[in-house]
Amino acid sequence: VGTSAGSFVGSLSAHGFNAFQLQKMALEIEKSDIIDLTIPDNGFIKGELLEKYVNRMVSNTPIERMRTPFYAIATDIGSGSEIVFAQGNTGMAVRASCSIPGVFRPMKIGGRTYVDGGVVSPVAVDVARRFGADIVIAVDISSDLDTRAPEGTVDTILQSINIMYAKISSAQLSRADLVIRPKVGHIGSAEFEKRHEAILE
C-alpha cells in the first residue's frame, strides 16, 4: 500500500524490482525524467512525465496484475474522501497519489479530481489492514518541522503540507505493528539532489 512517494516506490516494488534495482533506478533518475514544469495553474508540475515513467517501468502492467498486491491512495478533492486504487492504469494512480496540492496539477480521472493521498492518509496503515494485511510495517519519512521562515511559494506550500502530514501521521503510525524511521527528516520534499544521501540511509 502506497501513499504519495510511497505509491511511486510501491508500484515498482510490486512489479518485481528488488531493493538493489530500486536503488540503482533512484540514483540514475533525473528530474527531467519525471518533472514537467508548466505555467502555474493549480500547480507548477503537470505530472504527465511521472505517469509515463511509471508505466514504462512497469511495462504498462495494470494494478490488478502486479506480481505483489498493490494499492495506491489518493484524495478525492471534491469530497475530501480517501480513494484506494486497486485496479486500472498504474501510472495514473501513482500520479494521482503524488499530486501534492499547489505543486502538482490535480489529477482528473473519470469526472473526479484527485490530489496527494497524504492529505487524508499519509501512512495508509488502516488501508493495509482493510485489504487483509496481518502485519503492517510503516515507513515514516516525514520531514523535521522547519522553524525558519519559508523562502518563496513552493517552500510555503511544502512546509504547510509537512505540518499537516505530521499531525495526521502520528495517529496512523500508532496503529502499525512496526514503524521504520530512516533519518531523512532533514531532507526536504523538493531536495532532489540529496537522493543519494536518502538512499544510503
Specify the residue positions occupied by each region the protein language model found.
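Patatin-like phospholipase
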Residues: V1-T3, S11-E201
